[in-house]
């Protein structure tokens, strides 16, 4: 399920094109307050997958019934959403009620959400495969310290939004600062571009 609220439909459209190219089944639900406020209507009508688009217009009384939409869930289904925070929260709540497991509920962001005033501390990364240790200063990200040590890690957004730099966590207490991992994912992984040891001078052993 692809759930787009307002301009948040933009990344959902990109995902729909990709899913169609892969021959995967999907449905795209687009919620807007009015047709005048809706973008992409002509593009969606002409898309080769236009029969999978469901438009919900509040001003016309066709506001999305999120619980009814989520009722179509089958094992293995995933739900992705992007839009105003209130909309995404409602979608995630409905998905949870419908039984979507946490790892099957995904939030997409246009920009970095608000976050606490974090305090950076130096810490150490221990690479499980070699036993090598890499020091991370308070002024740099783990990915920067690894790069300086000659260890390449793929990075895309550098904001903890995309998950490209996800790495397995072997041991250590992590201050997770990403916006992509579920609670279950955080038990076994971390996002290297953002997350740090939870305590000053802590040691994180990672699967590198």
Q: What are these language model-derived features?
A:
Residues 1-131, 135-138:
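FNR/FR-type flavoprotein reductase catalytic core
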Residues 58, 195, 208:
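Active-site donor-binding loop signature of nucleotide-sugar glycosyltransferases
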Residues 102, 198, 205-208:
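Iron-sulfur (Fe-S) cluster-binding modules
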Residues 124-149, 166-175:
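Short, charged low-complexity linear segments at domain edges
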Residues 137-143, 180-183, 196-198:
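A short, sequence-level motif marking secondary-structure junctions
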Residues 177-185, 208:
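Short cysteine/histidine-rich metal-coordination sites, predominantly Zn2+-binding motifs
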């Amino acid at each position: 399920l692809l759930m787009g609220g307002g301009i948040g439909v933009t990344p959902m459209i990109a995902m729909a094109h990709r899913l169609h190219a892969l021959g995967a089944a999907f449905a795209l639900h687009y919620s807007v307050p009015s047709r005048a406020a809706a973008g992409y209507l002509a593009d969606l009508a002409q898309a080769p997958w236009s029969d999978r688009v469901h438009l919900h217009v509040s001003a016309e009384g066709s506001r999305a019934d999120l619980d009814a939409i989520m009722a179509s869930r089958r094992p293995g289904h995933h739900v992705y959403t992007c839009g105003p925070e209130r909309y995404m929260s409602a979608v995630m709540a409905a998905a949870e009620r419908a039984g979507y497991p946490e790892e099957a509920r995904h939030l997409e962001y246009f920009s970095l959400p608000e976050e606490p005033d974090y305090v950076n501390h130096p810490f150490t990364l221990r690479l499980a495969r070699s036993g090598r240790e890499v020091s991370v200063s308070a002024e740099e990200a783990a990915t920067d310290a690894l790069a300086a040590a000659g260890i390449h890690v793929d990075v895309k957004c550098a904001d903890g939004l995309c998950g490209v730099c996800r790495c397995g966590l072997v041991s250590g207490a992590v201050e997770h600062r990403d916006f992509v991992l579920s609670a279950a994912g955080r038990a076994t992984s971390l996002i290297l571009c953002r997350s740090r040891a939870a305590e000053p001078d802590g040691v994180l052993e990672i699967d590198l």
